[in-house]
C-alpha cells in the first residue's frame, strides 16, 4: 500500500440502495410519457418475455465517423411479445397529493390464465373470481355504463388493464402477467371509448412501437444470491498476506459514531433488483406468422428469428418479437416491460436509420456453423439418424 493516495472515489453507487430482492418479478412502470392530446389514442408500454440474444451486421450511417458506411457487428436482444388482451380500464383524478384512483371497470369475460393471477392455489380454489362482477353485464349493463361515464366526467388520466398470453410462449407457466398501461393521445372521452372498444380484444406490439424508436426496458435483474463485498461493490482486494481474508473491507468505520455507516460497502444480496435500462433502439419488430422474419434485403435466406435448436433455455419464438440493441436486464424467460421513452432523444445515434444486412440464426449452444437446417443438410448430406 505504498504511495497510497489520500483520496479515492468510493466503490459502488449509493443511488440504488437498498440492494435487496425486488418485491415483484414484473417490472413496474413508475412514470409514463407526457400526454399529447393532439395525437391518436395509443398504449405507452407493453409486456414481453426475454428470449435471448443474437448478433447482427449493418452498415453504419454516421457522417464524420471513421466507420461511416462500413459494416459493424452489434449484439441485440430478442423479446417475445405475443399480443396482449385488454380486460379493464382505470380512471385517475388529480389531487394535491398526486393521482388517486377513481374507479375500475373490468370486461365481462376473463380467461383462466388471468384468473389464476388472483389465486394462490388455482386447483384447490372454487374458481369463482369475477362471477358476481360479470353478472352486472347480464343486468342490461347500466352499472357498467355509469362507471364509464364517471371516468369520462371526473378522470384526468386513463389507464387500461391488459395481460399477456403466456400460453403462446414456450414457458411452462400458466399464470398471465397483468399490467396497468397508460393511454396517451386524444381526450379523456376518446380514451375511455378506445378502452371500451378493445375489451377482450388483443393489441399487438407494432401498434405501440415502431422501428428506429428509442424505448426503455424495465425488468428485474438476474439474481446472484448472497455475495461478498468484493463482487457486490467492486472494492479492491487486500494484499496477499492479509490476516483473515483478502476479499474484505479493511476499515468499516471510525470508533465514533459507534455504528457502521450506511455508506460502507458490505456483503449481502446481489442481483434480482428492479432496474430501468433507458434508450434502447428498436432494430426490428417482427411478425410471428412470417417465415422470413429474419431475412434482410442483403440476406434473402428464408429463415425465422429462432436460431437453430431454439434460444438456449427458452425455445422457439413463434409470436411477434421486438429486437433491441444491446443487453437488457433479467434472465431468459423473465417478463420485461417495454416503455416509450420519457423524452425525445436528439442524439445522432437515436436519429440514425438502421438497415440490417444480416441476422445470425446459428445455434447458440454449439459452434454455430450453419444458419438454417437446409444449409446444414446441403453440407452434411443425409445423416444416419434421418434414415
Swiss-Prot record:
It is found in: Cytoplasm. GO terms for cellular component: cytosolic large ribosomal subunit. GO terms for molecular function: RNA binding; structural constituent of ribosome. The keyword rRNA-binding does not apply. GO terms for biological process: maintenance of translational fidelity; ribosomal large subunit assembly; rRNA processing; translation; translational elongation. SUPFAM superfamilies: Translation proteins. Keywords: Cytoplasm, Ribonucleoprotein, Ribosomal protein. InterPro entries: L3_arc_euk (IPR045077), Ribosomal_L3_dom_3_arc_sf (IPR044892), Ribosomal_uL3 (IPR000597), Ribosomal_uL3_CS (IPR019926), Transl_B-barrel_sf (IPR009000). PANTHER family: 60S RIBOSOMAL PROTEIN L3-RELATED, LARGE RIBOSOMAL SUBUNIT PROTEIN UL3. Belongs to the universal ribosomal protein uL3 family. This is Large ribosomal subunit protein uL3. It comes from Eremothecium gossypii (strain ATCC 10895 / CBS 109.51 / FGSC 9923 / NRRL Y-1056) (Yeast).
Amino acid at each position: 500500500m505504498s504511495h497510497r493516495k489520500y483520496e479515492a472515489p468510493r466503490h459502488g453507487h449509493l443511488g440504488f440502495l437498498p440492494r435487496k430482492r425486488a418485491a415483484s418479478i414484473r417490472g413496474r412502470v413508475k412514470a409514463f410519457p407526457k400526454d399529447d392530446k393532439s395525437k391518436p389514442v395509443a398504449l405507452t408500454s407493453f409486456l414481453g418475455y426475454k428470449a435471448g440474444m443474437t448478433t447482427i451486421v449493418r452498415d453504419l450511417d454516421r457522417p464524420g465517423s471513421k466507420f461511416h458506411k462500413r459494416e459493424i457487428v452489434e449484439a441485440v436482444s430478442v423479446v417475445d411479445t405475443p399480443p396482449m388482451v385488454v380486460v379493464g380500464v382505470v380512471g385517475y383524478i388529480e389531487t394535491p397529493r398526486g393521482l388517486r384512483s377513481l374507479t375500475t371497470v373490468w370486461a365481462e369475460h376473463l380467461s383462466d390464465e388471468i384468473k389464476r393471477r388472483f389465486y394462490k392455489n388455482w386447483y384447490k380454489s372454487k374458481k369463482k373470481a369475477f362471477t358476481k362482477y360479470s353478472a352486472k353485464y347480464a343486468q342490461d349493463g347500466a352499472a357498467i355504463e355509469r362507471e364509464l361515464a364517471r371516468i369520462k366526467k371526473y378522470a384526468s388520466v386513463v389507464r387500461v388493464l391488459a395481460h399477456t398470453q403466456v400460453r403462446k410462449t414456450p414457458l411452462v407457466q400458466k399464470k398471465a402477467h397483468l399490467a396497468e398501461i397508460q393511454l396517451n393521445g386524444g381526450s379523456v372521452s376518446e380514451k375511455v371509448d378506445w378502452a371500451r372498444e378493445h375489451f377482450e380484444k388483443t393489441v399487438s406490439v407494432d401498434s405501440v412501437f415502431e422501428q428506429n424508436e428509442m424505448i426503455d426496458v424495465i425488468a428485474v435483474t438476474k439474481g446472484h444470491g448472497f455475495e461478498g463485498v468484493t463482487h457486490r461493490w467492486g472494492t479492491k482486494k487486500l494484499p496477499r498476506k492479509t490476516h483473515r481474508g483478502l476479499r474484505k473491507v479493511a476499515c468499516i468505520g471510525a470508533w465514533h459514531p459507534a455504528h457502521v455507516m450506511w455508506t460502507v460497502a458490505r456483503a449481502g444480496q446481489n442481483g434480482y433488483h428492479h432496474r430501468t435500462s433507458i434508450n434502447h433502439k428498436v432494430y426490428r419488430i417482427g411478425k410471428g406468422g412470417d417465415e422470413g422474419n429474419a431475412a434482410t434485403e442483403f440476406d434473402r435466406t428464408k429463415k425465422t428469428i429462432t436460431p437453430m435448436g431454439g434460444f438456449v433455455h427458452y425455445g422457439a419464438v413463434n409470436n411477434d418479437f421486438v429486437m433491441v440493441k444491446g443487453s437488457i436486464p433479467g434472465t431468459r424467460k423473465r417478463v420485461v416491460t417495454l416503455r416509450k421513452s420519457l423524452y425525445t432523444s436528439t442524439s445522432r445515434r437515436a436519429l440514425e436509420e438502421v438497415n440490417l444486412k444480416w441476422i445470425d440464426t446459428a445455434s447458440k449452444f454449439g459452434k454455430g456453423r450453419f444458419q438454417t437446417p437446409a444449409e446444414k443438410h446441403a453440407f452434411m448430406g443425409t445423416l444416419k439418424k434421418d434414415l
